[in-house]
C-alpha cells in the first residue's frame, strides 16, 4: 500500500514484516482490499522471543530511562526526598549519552558509598559510566617541581570496577523481575530487533526462453536464478554437485535477455 506498486510475494513478505503489518492494518481499517495483505503478513511474523532469550545490558538505548531510575531507587534505596525529582536517569538521542542527575546528593547511603560504590566514586557515578559503556578509572593528582600530574590509582580503580561489576550483575538480576516491565521490554525488543524476515526467492515463474529442452532446472536452481536477478548481490553457497554452473549460466542469459546486464562476470 505504501509504494502503490506490484511486488512479488517473496519480496513483500520479507524485510521488516512487523512494520509492514502495522502499515497494512492501518490501510485495511479503511480499505478492505488490503485485508489480504494483513492476513499473509500475519503468517510470516517472526516468533516472539521471551525473556530467557533476551539479554538486556546496561547502556542499551532501547531501555526506557525510567527503568534505569527505577533500578537506582530500588537497588540503591534512594531516599524519597531525593528520588522524587533530584536523582534520575535521562538519555539524549542526539548525543547518545546517558546522564544521572544529582549524583552527589545521596552521600550518607552505605549502599551508594560501600556496597555498590567506593569512598572515591559513588554508585550513581559508576552506574552512569556503565550506561555510557565506560570502565571507571580513578586518578590522583601529584604535585612536583614540574607541576601537577594525574596518575592512575590502580588500587582505587580496581575497587571501583569491582563495584561497577556488582551494579551490572544486580541489574541483570533485577531487570526481568517485575512482570509488567518484563512484558514491556520483551515487546520492545521484538518490535525493534526481531522484526526482519529474510527474503526467500521464488523462481518458479521464470520460463528461460531459448534454453534447450534437454535442460530442466530443479526448484532450488530456479530460486537461485531469481536471487541473482532480483537480489543484485548473491553468494551461491551450494555444495559440489548442486548445479551452480547451470545456475550461473541461466542467470546470465536471462539477465541479458531482460536487459539487466550486457557482460556478466562471476567471481
Feature locations, PLM:
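ASCE P-loop NTPase motor core, strongest for the SF2 helicase catalytic module
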Residues: 191-267
